[in-house]
């Protein structure tokens, strides 16, 4: 089985290679290459015809038989199948598709839309309920518990910010080493990997050859696909469209149209017929000399009679209700209008201040990160190496990477770095707080201005409406005849009571508007977010600077201990050198003394000789103490 698959793969590769070569020969080289000659079918036909003429005769007979027998039969079968498909299959497919579409549009789609709307409404309702439960019950409890815990156990907050600071340090180191590794990998790739390979001439030639062959093969496949599309698929698609348009056309409806006819794609049976009756009232002015005698139509006269026959009680009730509804609507919308004005102003201020504060917070964060990097680099420069410039004979210092430092890192310079970090962050914090205070002052001032404007507008409107309404009620009292006064007295008394009730309600609404609390939820949420972000940045900056200060202090202590040890060592070496010099001077003075004193200094010479013998075996740091002991012996 594996052998068969390998043979098939090899055959496929050979066919593809042969096809690409023939395409190149036919379209680009015009048969000038030798490979085009050897891959041409005429070449092999001539060779085989010269050696095996029977094979050529047999192949020609097969081709003639194919053209005379097989092609007509296959063509007739194809024509038969084509006619069958066009006459039976295509109309049935069209009818089925139309009925399916009609079923989907009339029954399936409305139900899907209905249930989807129900599901969406249920999901939205459930989501809103969940958000409400979380906002009202869960979030305040969690926030309260968090702040109580932080107040009761402050070390937890310190631990949290310490962990965050350590995480930022770790992130900085990881990013640093990642960049180093990436750079080294890139350098290695450029020296020994693909970069080196891409500079090889043989690889370049092979790559260009492969790319050229791939382009040729792509063009060949693309041309074949285009040719197949134009010659085979496009005619079939065009004929199918024509037949679908022919079978799917809507015929005009006639008196003998069958209701079950499938050519009617859609029929609307729910259209209700209706008639509209219009009444025209004609008004005619007749003069004394006119001979016209015009009469109103029955419908017009009936309409006029209905309006005239309306009772006074109904007219009063309708008029009173119109005034009452207008005033009640205004009272109910007064607070909403005021809140809408406030919200529009708050949104305008929020759109104006939000980019500024976001930029300031970003600057504060970037400034902190920059100062952290500067201080971290300064801490690394504490442990430096001292050297001497051979040209200027000045002391210079190098860091761990053997890079010369511009300045020697001292505690005073480190304090300046920390002071600059604190001052820069404090300046940005003060600027952010100043913007917040300015925003609060502007909002409060404008809220009072809007409140005063709305109150004045409401007072003016209420004064006009109440006055006009009271005048209207008074006119009704005067216009009513004495005969009907007894019947309408009760109604008018009730109207006056309702009028006074609404008047008191107007006054109460005005007082409420004067003291109505303003809820700026979006603006307050934004201010809280900015304050929380600033608090978080301040905590992170303080904690991380504290950690860096401790680390810098440890580095300075280690360096000072090393310098102290070095100074002590140098001091001990200088003392040893001084002692050895004094000893040599005393030895030379004893050897140059007079012979008369030789007998008295025998013990001293003996001790000096013993000292010279012992000096070779004792350590350098014990030389001074040994010399003092010998001097005391000599003096004695």
Curated annotation (Swiss-Prot):
Residues 565-607 are annotated as: Disordered. Residues 1-23 form the signal peptide. It is found in: Mitochondrion. The keyword Metal-binding does not apply. One of its GO terms (cellular component) is mitochondrion. One of its GO terms (biological process) is sporulation resulting in formation of a cellular spore. Its main location: mitochondrion. Residues 433-460, 551-584 form a coiled coil. The keyword Ribonucleoprotein applies. Residues 579-607 have a biased composition (Low complexity). Keywords: Coiled coil, Mitochondrion, Ribonucleoprotein, Signal, Sporulation. Component of the mitochondria-localized RNase mitochondrial RNA-processing (RNase MRP) composed of one single RNA encoded by the NME1 gene and at least 31 proteins. Absent in the nucleus-localized RNase MRP (NuMRP). Involved in spore wall assembly. May be a component of the mitochondrial RNase MRP (MtMRP), a ribonucleoprotein endoribonuclease involved in the cleaving RNA transcripts to generate primers for DNA replication in mitochondria. Belongs to the SHE10 family. This is Outer spore wall assembly protein SHE10. The lineage of its organism: Eukaryota, Fungi, Dikarya, Ascomycota, Saccharomycotina. The gene is SHE10.
